Amino acid sequence: MEIHTYEKEFFDLLKRISHYSEAVALMHWDSRTGAPKNGSEDRAESIGQLSTDIFNIQTSDRMKELIDVLYERFDDLSEDTKKAVELAKKEYEENKKIPEAEYKEYVILCSKAETAWEEAKGKSDFSLFSPYLEQLIEFNKRFITYWGYQEHPYDALLDLFEPGVTVKVLDQLFAELKEAIIPLVKQVTASGNKPDTSFITKAFPKEKQKELSLYFLQELGYDFDGGRLDETVHPFATTLNRGDVRVTTRYDEKDFRTAIFGTIHECGHAIYEQNIDEALSGTNLSDGASMGIHESQSLFYENFIGRNKHFWTPYYKKIQEASPVQFKDISLDDFVRAINESKPSFIRVEADELTYPLHIIIRYEIEKAIFSNEVSVEDLPSLWNQKYQDYLGITPQTDAEGILQDVHWAGGDFGYFPSYALGYMYAAQLKQKMLEDLPEFDALLERGEFHPIKQWLTEKVHIHGKRKKPLDIIKDATGEELNVRYLIDYLSNKYSNLYLL
Protein backbone atom coordinates (compact mmCIF):
# COMPACT_ATOMS: atom_id res chain seq x y z
CA MET A 1 0.00 0.00 0.00
CA GLU A 2 1.11 3.55 -0.69
CA ILE A 3 2.18 5.62 2.32
CA HIS A 4 -0.66 8.12 1.77
CA THR A 5 -3.20 5.30 2.22
CA TYR A 6 -1.82 4.63 5.71
CA GLU A 7 -1.72 8.37 6.38
CA LYS A 8 -5.36 8.73 5.42
CA GLU A 9 -6.42 5.86 7.68
CA PHE A 10 -4.33 7.30 10.54
CA PHE A 11 -5.97 10.72 10.21
CA ASP A 12 -9.41 9.09 9.89
CA LEU A 13 -8.84 7.50 13.31
CA LEU A 14 -7.79 10.87 14.76
CA LYS A 15 -10.92 12.43 13.27
CA ARG A 16 -13.09 9.78 14.91
CA ILE A 17 -11.40 10.49 18.26
CA SER A 18 -12.14 14.21 17.81
CA HIS A 19 -15.85 13.43 17.22
CA TYR A 20 -16.08 11.40 20.43
CA SER A 21 -14.13 14.10 22.29
CA GLU A 22 -16.61 16.72 21.11
CA ALA A 23 -19.51 14.70 22.56
CA VAL A 24 -17.68 14.27 25.89
CA ALA A 25 -16.82 17.99 26.02
CA LEU A 26 -20.47 18.89 25.36
CA MET A 27 -21.64 16.66 28.23
CA HIS A 28 -19.01 18.11 30.57
CA TRP A 29 -20.08 21.64 29.61
CA ASP A 30 -23.74 20.72 30.11
CA SER A 31 -23.11 19.16 33.53
CA ARG A 32 -21.44 22.37 34.74
CA THR A 33 -23.93 24.86 33.28
CA GLY A 34 -27.22 23.66 34.71
CA ALA A 35 -27.86 20.07 33.64
CA PRO A 36 -30.43 18.32 35.89
CA LYS A 37 -28.76 16.85 38.98
CA ASN A 38 -30.87 13.68 38.78
CA GLY A 39 -29.22 12.80 35.48
CA SER A 40 -25.68 12.99 36.82
CA GLU A 41 -25.26 9.23 37.40
CA ASP A 42 -26.37 8.25 33.87
CA ARG A 43 -24.41 11.15 32.39
CA ALA A 44 -21.29 9.90 34.19
CA GLU A 45 -21.88 6.46 32.64
CA SER A 46 -22.23 8.00 29.16
CA ILE A 47 -19.06 10.05 29.59
CA GLY A 48 -17.30 6.92 30.85
CA GLN A 49 -18.39 4.87 27.83
CA LEU A 50 -17.42 7.50 25.25
CA SER A 51 -14.09 8.14 26.99
CA THR A 52 -13.45 4.39 26.93
CA ASP A 53 -14.21 4.34 23.21
CA ILE A 54 -11.63 7.10 22.69
CA PHE A 55 -9.16 5.15 24.83
CA ASN A 56 -9.81 2.00 22.79
CA ILE A 57 -9.11 3.77 19.49
CA GLN A 58 -5.93 5.35 20.87
CA THR A 59 -4.68 1.97 22.10
CA SER A 60 -6.03 -0.24 19.30
CA ASP A 61 -3.84 -2.73 17.45
CA ARG A 62 -4.62 -0.87 14.24
CA MET A 63 -3.42 2.44 15.70
CA LYS A 64 -0.18 0.71 16.71
CA GLU A 65 0.22 -0.81 13.22
CA LEU A 66 -0.34 2.57 11.54
CA ILE A 67 2.11 4.32 13.88
CA ASP A 68 4.74 1.63 13.17
CA VAL A 69 4.26 1.80 9.39
CA LEU A 70 4.42 5.61 9.38
CA TYR A 71 7.55 5.54 11.56
CA GLU A 72 9.22 3.28 9.00
CA ARG A 73 8.65 5.98 6.35
CA PHE A 74 9.08 8.89 8.77
CA ASP A 75 11.35 10.95 6.49
CA ASP A 76 8.69 10.87 3.73
CA LEU A 77 6.03 12.44 5.95
CA SER A 78 5.08 16.12 6.11
CA GLU A 79 6.14 18.03 9.23
CA ASP A 80 2.58 18.10 10.58
CA THR A 81 2.14 14.36 10.01
CA LYS A 82 5.43 13.68 11.81
CA LYS A 83 4.25 15.68 14.83
CA ALA A 84 0.84 13.96 14.82
CA VAL A 85 2.42 10.50 14.65
CA GLU A 86 4.89 11.33 17.45
CA LEU A 87 2.06 12.55 19.68
CA ALA A 88 -0.13 9.53 18.88
CA LYS A 89 2.80 7.23 19.76
CA LYS A 90 3.30 9.00 23.11
CA GLU A 91 -0.43 8.76 23.90
CA TYR A 92 -0.53 5.11 22.80
CA GLU A 93 2.37 4.19 25.07
CA GLU A 94 0.91 6.12 28.04
CA ASN A 95 -2.58 4.72 27.64
CA LYS A 96 -1.61 1.16 26.79
CA LYS A 97 -0.02 0.82 30.20
CA ILE A 98 -3.41 1.39 31.91
CA PRO A 99 -5.87 -1.57 31.83
CA GLU A 100 -9.03 -0.66 29.91
CA ALA A 101 -11.46 -1.58 32.70
CA GLU A 102 -9.43 0.45 35.18
CA TYR A 103 -9.46 3.48 32.89
CA LYS A 104 -13.25 3.32 32.48
CA GLU A 105 -13.69 2.97 36.25
CA TYR A 106 -11.47 6.02 36.74
CA VAL A 107 -13.39 8.21 34.25
CA ILE A 108 -16.69 7.33 35.93
CA LEU A 109 -15.15 8.06 39.34
CA CYS A 110 -14.01 11.51 38.13
CA SER A 111 -17.51 12.38 36.97
CA LYS A 112 -19.05 11.27 40.29
CA ALA A 113 -16.30 13.04 42.22
CA GLU A 114 -17.09 16.35 40.50
CA THR A 115 -20.72 16.05 41.60
CA ALA A 116 -19.63 15.18 45.16
CA TRP A 117 -17.16 18.08 45.18
CA GLU A 118 -19.89 20.52 44.16
CA GLU A 119 -22.09 19.36 47.05
CA ALA A 120 -19.16 19.35 49.50
CA LYS A 121 -18.15 22.85 48.48
CA GLY A 122 -21.74 24.08 48.81
CA LYS A 123 -21.96 22.63 52.34
CA SER A 124 -18.31 23.43 53.16
CA ASP A 125 -17.79 19.85 54.30
CA PHE A 126 -14.56 18.12 53.20
CA SER A 127 -15.79 14.75 54.53
CA LEU A 128 -18.37 14.57 51.70
CA PHE A 129 -15.55 14.70 49.13
CA SER A 130 -12.62 13.02 50.90
CA PRO A 131 -13.63 9.37 50.11
CA TYR A 132 -13.62 10.25 46.39
CA LEU A 133 -10.33 12.12 46.71
CA GLU A 134 -8.78 9.10 48.44
CA GLN A 135 -9.76 6.88 45.50
CA LEU A 136 -8.61 9.43 42.90
CA ILE A 137 -5.18 9.65 44.54
CA GLU A 138 -4.87 5.84 44.69
CA PHE A 139 -5.73 5.57 40.99
CA ASN A 140 -3.10 8.17 40.12
CA LYS A 141 -0.47 6.46 42.25
CA ARG A 142 -1.15 3.25 40.30
CA PHE A 143 -0.96 5.14 37.00
CA ILE A 144 2.44 6.52 38.03
CA THR A 145 3.73 2.98 38.60
CA TYR A 146 2.39 1.95 35.17
CA TRP A 147 4.03 4.90 33.41
CA GLY A 148 7.25 4.97 35.40
CA TYR A 149 9.42 8.00 36.13
CA GLN A 150 13.09 8.91 36.38
CA GLU A 151 13.52 11.08 39.48
CA HIS A 152 10.26 11.85 41.29
CA PRO A 153 6.86 10.08 41.07
CA TYR A 154 5.12 13.46 40.67
CA ASP A 155 7.13 14.03 37.44
CA ALA A 156 4.89 11.50 35.68
CA LEU A 157 1.82 13.67 36.38
CA LEU A 158 3.53 16.99 35.61
CA ASP A 159 4.49 15.65 32.17
CA LEU A 160 0.82 15.15 31.28
CA PHE A 161 0.23 18.91 31.50
CA GLU A 162 3.63 20.46 30.85
CA PRO A 163 5.90 18.15 28.80
CA GLY A 164 9.53 18.49 29.86
CA VAL A 165 8.83 20.10 33.24
CA THR A 166 9.92 18.20 36.37
CA VAL A 167 10.02 18.62 40.16
CA LYS A 168 13.69 19.56 39.80
CA VAL A 169 12.82 22.41 37.38
CA LEU A 170 9.86 23.64 39.44
CA ASP A 171 11.66 23.52 42.78
CA GLN A 172 14.26 25.91 41.37
CA LEU A 173 11.77 28.29 39.68
CA PHE A 174 9.42 28.37 42.66
CA ALA A 175 12.24 28.89 45.16
CA GLU A 176 13.29 32.00 43.21
CA LEU A 177 9.69 33.22 43.01
CA LYS A 178 9.04 32.67 46.72
CA GLU A 179 12.25 34.43 47.68
CA ALA A 180 11.16 37.54 45.75
CA ILE A 181 7.41 37.54 46.37
CA ILE A 182 6.93 36.66 50.05
CA PRO A 183 8.90 39.74 51.28
CA LEU A 184 7.13 41.94 48.70
CA VAL A 185 3.71 40.70 49.90
CA LYS A 186 4.72 41.58 53.48
CA GLN A 187 5.84 45.08 52.40
CA VAL A 188 2.60 45.69 50.49
CA THR A 189 0.50 44.39 53.40
CA ALA A 190 2.33 46.73 55.80
CA SER A 191 2.16 49.75 53.48
CA GLY A 192 0.14 52.76 54.60
CA ASN A 193 -0.56 53.74 50.96
CA LYS A 194 -3.46 51.39 50.34
CA PRO A 195 -6.12 52.07 47.68
CA ASP A 196 -9.70 52.82 48.67
CA THR A 197 -11.71 49.76 47.64
CA SER A 198 -14.91 50.52 49.57
CA PHE A 199 -16.84 51.14 46.33
CA ILE A 200 -15.91 47.71 44.90
CA THR A 201 -18.37 45.76 47.04
CA LYS A 202 -21.39 47.98 46.44
CA ALA A 203 -24.28 46.41 44.56
CA PHE A 204 -23.59 45.99 40.84
CA PRO A 205 -26.60 44.42 39.06
CA LYS A 206 -25.95 40.96 37.64
CA GLU A 207 -27.63 41.78 34.32
CA LYS A 208 -25.33 44.77 33.85
CA GLN A 209 -22.32 42.58 34.62
CA LYS A 210 -23.50 40.13 31.98
CA GLU A 211 -23.86 42.92 29.40
CA LEU A 212 -20.33 44.11 30.17
CA SER A 213 -18.93 40.57 29.99
CA LEU A 214 -20.46 40.10 26.54
CA TYR A 215 -19.21 43.54 25.47
CA PHE A 216 -15.60 42.94 26.55
CA LEU A 217 -15.51 39.51 24.89
CA GLN A 218 -16.58 41.14 21.62
CA GLU A 219 -14.10 44.03 21.94
CA LEU A 220 -11.14 41.76 22.71
CA GLY A 221 -11.71 39.67 19.59
CA TYR A 222 -13.70 36.64 20.78
CA ASP A 223 -15.77 35.33 17.86
CA PHE A 224 -19.40 34.91 18.95
CA ASP A 225 -20.23 33.08 15.72
CA GLY A 226 -18.00 30.38 17.17
CA GLY A 227 -18.90 30.59 20.85
CA ARG A 228 -21.23 31.66 23.66
CA LEU A 229 -21.17 32.86 27.27
CA ASP A 230 -22.86 30.96 30.11
CA GLU A 231 -22.94 31.00 33.90
CA THR A 232 -21.28 28.40 36.14
CA VAL A 233 -19.90 27.82 39.66
CA HIS A 234 -16.24 27.50 38.63
CA PRO A 235 -15.53 29.43 35.38
CA PHE A 236 -13.93 27.63 32.45
CA ALA A 237 -13.63 27.71 28.66
CA THR A 238 -14.19 24.57 26.61
CA THR A 239 -13.66 23.62 22.98
CA LEU A 240 -16.12 21.37 21.18
CA ASN A 241 -14.45 22.06 17.85
CA ARG A 242 -12.59 24.98 16.29
CA GLY A 243 -15.91 26.64 15.43
CA ASP A 244 -17.47 26.13 18.87
CA VAL A 245 -15.37 27.45 21.76
CA ARG A 246 -17.52 28.28 24.81
CA VAL A 247 -16.83 30.61 27.73
CA THR A 248 -18.39 30.59 31.20
CA THR A 249 -18.26 33.06 34.08
CA ARG A 250 -19.60 33.62 37.59
CA TYR A 251 -21.46 36.73 38.76
CA ASP A 252 -21.20 38.29 42.21
CA GLU A 253 -23.36 41.37 42.74
CA LYS A 254 -21.14 42.40 45.67
CA ASP A 255 -17.91 42.21 43.64
CA PHE A 256 -18.04 42.94 39.91
CA ARG A 257 -14.38 41.91 39.54
CA THR A 258 -15.29 38.22 39.77
CA ALA A 259 -17.25 38.30 36.51
CA ILE A 260 -15.33 40.98 34.59
CA PHE A 261 -11.84 39.61 35.15
CA GLY A 262 -13.03 36.01 35.11
CA THR A 263 -14.57 36.60 31.69
CA ILE A 264 -11.47 38.35 30.34
CA HIS A 265 -9.36 35.45 31.66
CA GLU A 266 -11.49 32.81 29.91
CA CYS A 267 -11.53 35.02 26.80
CA GLY A 268 -7.74 34.53 26.56
CA HIS A 269 -8.20 30.75 26.59
CA ALA A 270 -10.96 30.92 23.99
CA ILE A 271 -9.13 33.26 21.59
CA TYR A 272 -6.22 30.81 21.65
CA GLU A 273 -8.48 27.90 20.67
CA GLN A 274 -10.30 29.93 18.00
CA ASN A 275 -7.02 30.79 16.28
CA ILE A 276 -5.23 27.44 16.09
CA ASP A 277 -4.32 26.67 12.47
CA GLU A 278 -7.43 25.40 10.69
CA ALA A 279 -5.26 22.85 8.88
CA LEU A 280 -4.92 21.01 12.20
CA SER A 281 -8.69 20.62 12.79
CA GLY A 282 -9.74 17.07 13.57
CA THR A 283 -6.19 16.01 14.44
CA ASN A 284 -4.42 15.54 17.76
CA LEU A 285 -2.46 18.77 17.09
CA SER A 286 -5.57 20.98 17.21
CA ASP A 287 -5.15 21.88 20.87
CA GLY A 288 -3.10 24.14 23.10
CA ALA A 289 0.60 23.28 23.35
CA SER A 290 0.28 22.72 27.10
CA MET A 291 -1.76 23.85 30.07
CA GLY A 292 0.94 26.42 30.88
CA ILE A 293 0.91 27.93 27.40
CA HIS A 294 -2.89 28.01 27.60
CA GLU A 295 -2.69 29.77 30.94
CA SER A 296 -0.19 32.26 29.55
CA GLN A 297 -2.87 33.44 27.13
CA SER A 298 -5.63 33.78 29.74
CA LEU A 299 -3.30 35.57 32.18
CA PHE A 300 -1.98 37.82 29.42
CA TYR A 301 -5.52 39.00 28.68
CA GLU A 302 -6.63 39.21 32.30
CA ASN A 303 -3.56 40.94 33.75
CA PHE A 304 -1.45 42.58 31.06
CA ILE A 305 -4.53 43.90 29.26
CA GLY A 306 -7.45 43.82 31.72
CA ARG A 307 -5.66 45.29 34.75
CA ASN A 308 -3.70 47.84 32.73
CA LYS A 309 -4.64 51.51 33.22
CA HIS A 310 -4.34 52.11 29.47
CA PHE A 311 -7.06 49.51 28.83
CA TRP A 312 -9.47 51.31 31.14
CA THR A 313 -8.82 54.76 29.65
CA PRO A 314 -11.46 54.22 26.91
CA TYR A 315 -13.61 51.71 28.81
CA TYR A 316 -14.00 53.05 32.34
CA LYS A 317 -17.02 55.06 31.25
CA LYS A 318 -18.77 51.76 30.35
CA ILE A 319 -18.39 50.63 33.98
CA GLN A 320 -19.65 54.00 35.22
CA GLU A 321 -22.71 53.81 32.96
CA ALA A 322 -23.49 50.25 34.12
CA SER A 323 -23.49 51.17 37.84
CA PRO A 324 -23.61 55.00 38.02
CA VAL A 325 -24.15 55.45 41.77
CA GLN A 326 -21.30 53.08 42.60
CA PHE A 327 -18.70 54.85 40.42
CA LYS A 328 -20.04 58.44 40.37
CA ASP A 329 -17.22 60.01 42.39
CA ILE A 330 -14.46 57.50 41.58
CA SER A 331 -11.69 58.75 39.28
CA LEU A 332 -10.01 56.51 36.70
CA ASP A 333 -6.79 56.49 38.77
CA ASP A 334 -8.64 55.45 41.92
CA PHE A 335 -10.50 52.75 39.98
CA VAL A 336 -7.27 51.33 38.54
CA ARG A 337 -5.55 51.32 41.93
CA ALA A 338 -8.55 49.54 43.45
CA ILE A 339 -8.72 46.77 40.81
CA ASN A 340 -4.99 46.21 41.32
CA GLU A 341 -5.23 46.04 45.09
CA SER A 342 -3.04 43.37 46.64
CA LYS A 343 -3.89 41.68 49.89
CA PRO A 344 -3.67 38.08 51.05
CA SER A 345 -6.90 36.21 50.32
CA PHE A 346 -8.19 32.65 50.42
CA ILE A 347 -9.59 32.12 46.92
CA ARG A 348 -7.09 31.42 44.13
CA VAL A 349 -9.30 32.50 41.23
CA GLU A 350 -9.95 35.85 42.92
CA ALA A 351 -6.35 36.42 44.04
CA ASP A 352 -4.47 39.50 42.88
CA GLU A 353 -1.47 39.33 40.57
CA LEU A 354 1.10 39.55 43.35
CA THR A 355 -0.23 36.87 45.69
CA TYR A 356 -1.49 34.54 42.92
CA PRO A 357 1.82 32.67 42.45
CA LEU A 358 1.86 31.79 46.16
CA HIS A 359 -1.57 30.12 45.83
CA ILE A 360 -0.07 27.93 43.10
CA ILE A 361 3.13 27.15 44.99
CA ILE A 362 1.03 26.00 47.98
CA ARG A 363 -0.90 23.58 45.76
CA TYR A 364 2.30 22.37 44.11
CA GLU A 365 3.93 21.63 47.45
CA ILE A 366 0.82 19.79 48.70
CA GLU A 367 0.52 17.67 45.55
CA LYS A 368 4.23 16.88 45.71
CA ALA A 369 3.71 15.75 49.34
CA ILE A 370 0.70 13.59 48.35
CA PHE A 371 2.67 11.70 45.70
CA SER A 372 5.73 11.41 47.94
CA ASN A 373 3.46 9.66 50.48
CA GLU A 374 4.20 12.38 53.03
CA VAL A 375 0.60 13.33 53.87
CA SER A 376 -2.73 11.51 54.30
CA VAL A 377 -6.03 12.71 52.83
CA GLU A 378 -7.46 13.41 56.30
CA ASP A 379 -4.52 15.73 57.07
CA LEU A 380 -4.81 17.73 53.84
CA PRO A 381 -7.11 20.49 55.20
CA SER A 382 -4.74 21.24 58.09
CA LEU A 383 -1.66 21.17 55.82
CA TRP A 384 -3.45 23.53 53.41
CA ASN A 385 -4.36 25.93 56.21
CA GLN A 386 -0.84 25.87 57.65
CA LYS A 387 0.73 26.80 54.31
CA TYR A 388 -1.72 29.69 53.87
CA GLN A 389 -0.66 30.94 57.28
CA ASP A 390 3.06 30.53 56.50
CA TYR A 391 3.04 32.15 53.04
CA LEU A 392 0.14 34.61 53.13
CA GLY A 393 -0.36 35.19 56.85
CA ILE A 394 -4.01 34.08 56.80
CA THR A 395 -5.85 30.89 57.82
CA PRO A 396 -9.00 29.65 56.02
CA GLN A 397 -11.95 29.35 58.41
CA THR A 398 -13.99 26.89 56.31
CA ASP A 399 -13.33 24.03 53.89
CA ALA A 400 -15.08 25.96 51.10
CA GLU A 401 -12.62 28.84 51.31
CA GLY A 402 -9.78 26.38 51.85
CA ILE A 403 -9.18 22.96 50.40
CA LEU A 404 -12.54 22.62 48.57
CA GLN A 405 -12.29 25.77 46.47
CA ASP A 406 -10.88 24.19 43.27
CA VAL A 407 -12.50 21.57 41.03
CA HIS A 408 -9.18 20.21 39.71
CA TRP A 409 -8.67 17.27 42.07
CA ALA A 410 -12.28 16.17 41.56
CA GLY A 411 -11.52 15.88 37.84
CA GLY A 412 -8.34 13.93 38.56
CA ASP A 413 -6.14 16.81 37.42
CA PHE A 414 -3.16 16.29 39.71
CA GLY A 415 -0.11 18.03 38.28
CA TYR A 416 -2.18 20.78 36.63
CA PHE A 417 -1.71 23.60 39.17
CA PRO A 418 1.99 24.34 38.44
CA SER A 419 0.96 25.18 34.86
CA TYR A 420 -0.79 28.30 36.17
CA ALA A 421 2.47 29.69 37.59
CA LEU A 422 4.42 28.60 34.50
CA GLY A 423 1.77 30.31 32.38
CA TYR A 424 2.36 33.50 34.35
CA MET A 425 6.11 33.26 33.68
CA TYR A 426 5.48 32.55 29.99
CA ALA A 427 3.07 35.51 29.77
CA ALA A 428 5.55 37.95 31.36
CA GLN A 429 8.29 36.87 28.97
CA LEU A 430 5.96 37.14 25.94
CA LYS A 431 4.86 40.60 27.09
CA GLN A 432 8.48 41.77 27.30
CA LYS A 433 9.13 40.59 23.73
CA MET A 434 5.84 42.06 22.50
CA LEU A 435 6.88 45.50 23.83
CA GLU A 436 9.96 45.29 21.59
CA ASP A 437 7.88 44.36 18.54
CA LEU A 438 4.87 46.58 19.40
CA PRO A 439 6.28 49.58 21.30
CA GLU A 440 2.87 51.23 20.85
CA PHE A 441 1.25 48.53 23.07
CA ASP A 442 -0.12 51.03 25.62
CA ALA A 443 -1.39 53.34 22.87
CA LEU A 444 -3.21 50.42 21.24
CA LEU A 445 -4.99 49.70 24.53
CA GLU A 446 -5.99 53.36 24.87
CA ARG A 447 -7.53 53.26 21.40
CA GLY A 448 -9.26 49.92 22.01
CA GLU A 449 -7.29 48.39 19.12
CA PHE A 450 -6.61 44.80 20.10
CA HIS A 451 -6.12 43.26 16.68
CA PRO A 452 -2.32 43.84 16.45
CA ILE A 453 -1.90 42.30 19.92
CA LYS A 454 -4.09 39.32 19.04
CA GLN A 455 -2.27 38.96 15.70
CA TRP A 456 1.14 38.90 17.42
CA LEU A 457 -0.04 36.22 19.87
CA THR A 458 -1.63 34.21 17.06
CA GLU A 459 1.59 34.21 15.00
CA LYS A 460 3.86 33.43 17.96
CA VAL A 461 1.61 31.07 19.93
CA HIS A 462 -1.95 30.28 18.82
CA ILE A 463 -1.49 29.09 15.26
CA HIS A 464 0.99 26.36 16.21
CA GLY A 465 -1.46 24.32 18.29
CA LYS A 466 0.47 21.30 19.57
CA ARG A 467 3.07 21.44 16.80
CA LYS A 468 5.65 22.71 19.29
CA LYS A 469 6.52 21.89 22.90
CA PRO A 470 5.83 24.68 25.43
CA LEU A 471 9.43 25.64 26.13
CA ASP A 472 10.14 25.71 22.37
CA ILE A 473 7.22 28.09 21.80
CA ILE A 474 8.67 30.47 24.40
CA LYS A 475 12.20 30.22 23.03
CA ASP A 476 11.08 30.71 19.42
CA ALA A 477 8.79 33.62 20.33
CA THR A 478 11.19 35.48 22.63
CA GLY A 479 14.65 34.34 21.56
CA GLU A 480 15.60 32.95 24.97
CA GLU A 481 14.92 30.14 27.43
CA LEU A 482 12.25 30.53 30.12
CA ASN A 483 13.37 33.21 32.58
CA VAL A 484 11.44 33.84 35.82
CA ARG A 485 13.06 37.28 36.24
CA TYR A 486 10.59 38.89 33.80
CA LEU A 487 7.69 38.02 36.09
CA ILE A 488 9.56 39.03 39.25
CA ASP A 489 10.59 42.38 37.72
CA TYR A 490 7.05 43.06 36.45
CA LEU A 491 5.50 42.39 39.87
CA SER A 492 8.20 44.29 41.78
CA ASN A 493 7.92 47.38 39.56
CA LYS A 494 4.13 47.40 39.43
CA TYR A 495 3.48 46.95 43.15
CA SER A 496 6.34 49.18 44.29
CA ASN A 497 4.75 51.98 42.24
CA LEU A 498 1.15 51.23 43.25
CA TYR A 499 1.99 51.11 46.96
CA LEU A 500 4.77 53.75 46.88
CA LEU A 501 7.26 51.34 48.46
Swiss-Prot record:
Q: What is its EC number?
A: 3.4.17.19
Which cofactor is essential here?
Zn(2+)
Q: Where is this motif: HPF?
A: 234-236
Q: Where does the motif DXRXT lie? A: 244-248
Q: Which reaction does it catalyse?
A: Release of a C-terminal amino acid with broad specificity, except for -Pro
Q: What terms describe the molecular function in GO for this protein? A: metallocarboxypeptidase activity; zinc ion binding
List ligand-binding residues for Zn(2+): 265, 269, 295
In chain numbering, where does the motif HES/GQ fall? 294-297
Q: How is the cofactor bound?
A: Binds 1 zinc ion per subunit.
Chain positions of motif I/NRXXA/SD: 347-352
InterPro entries to which the protein is assigned, alphabetical: Peptidase_M32_Taq
What biological-process GO terms show up in the record?
Answer: proteolysis
Question: In which residues does the motif GXXQDXHW occur?
Answer: 402-409
Q: Which residues form the Peptidase M32 domain?
A: 3-496
**What are the UniProt keywords, alphabetically?**
Carboxypeptidase, Hydrolase, Metal-binding, Metalloprotease, Protease, Zinc
| Active-site residues (renumbered) | 266
Question: Could you give the subunit structure recorded for this chain?
Answer: Homodimer.
Q: What is this protein called?
A: Carboxypeptidase 1
In which organism is this protein found?
A: Bacillus subtilis (strain 168)
